[in-house]
Regions:
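Alpha-helical segment that forms one wall of the substrate-binding/catalytic cleft
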Residues: 51, 55-107, 117-124
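Extracellular/periplasmic catalytic domains that process cell-envelope and extracellular macromolecules
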Residues: 16-18, 40, 89-93
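Short N-proximal segments of mature Sec-exported proteins
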Residues: 29, 37-55
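Sec-dependent N-terminal signal peptides
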Residues: 3-13
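Short, well-structured alpha-helical interface segments that form or flank functional binding sites
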Residues: 20, 41-44, 71
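Secretory-pathway/luminal and periplasmic proteins that interact with or process carbohydrate-rich
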Residues: 30-36, 103-114
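Structural recognition of the beta-strand scaffold that forms the well-ordered cores
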Residues: 24, 46-48, 98-99
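Short N-terminal segments immediately surrounding and downstream of signal-peptide cleavage
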Residues: 17-35
Length: 124
């Protein structure tokens, strides 16, 4: 019984932490506007998801579905699980932020995501 209670607490803490990360991500990307559009990059929704990112997540449907914040979160989680599963499991928000901003090749030029990570970190 103690084990189940401990597991529940750990799972609750992890869920709260990922929610905190997504709150910071939304604030930095769109000022928490689920209808935001970056016309230059055609990045949509609260997390400013580009078409290639959406397609790469493999959740299916249309890119425009990311205007729904719940779907946008699902897209991000699928993308994170695909490219940085250990970071997602460990709540390594620095790695997840850099992946979100720099794409799956972000490690080739880590410094390109430095300022982005600082913005996310400030909002955590």
């Amino acid at each position: 019984m103690k084990y189940l209670f401990s597991l529940f607490i750990v799972c609750s803490i992890n869920a709260a932490n990922i929610d905190t990360f997504f709150a910071a991500l939304g604030k930095v990307e769109s000022s928490n506007n689920p209808r935001a559009i970056n016309k230059k990059e055609y990045a949509l929704g609260i997390y400013q998801i580009r078409a290639a990112y959406f397609k790469d997540s493999k959740i299916g449907g249309k890119h425009e579905s990311v205007y729904d914040a719940a779907i946008a979160k699902k897209v991000c989680l699928a993308y994170f699980a695909k490219y940085e599963p250990q970071a997602l499991k460990n709540n390594d928000f620095e790695t997840l932020a850099r992946l979100h901003n720099g794409g799956c090749g972000w490690r080739k030029n880590k410094s390109a995501t430095d300022s982005y990570w600082k913005k996310i970190k400030k909002n955590l």
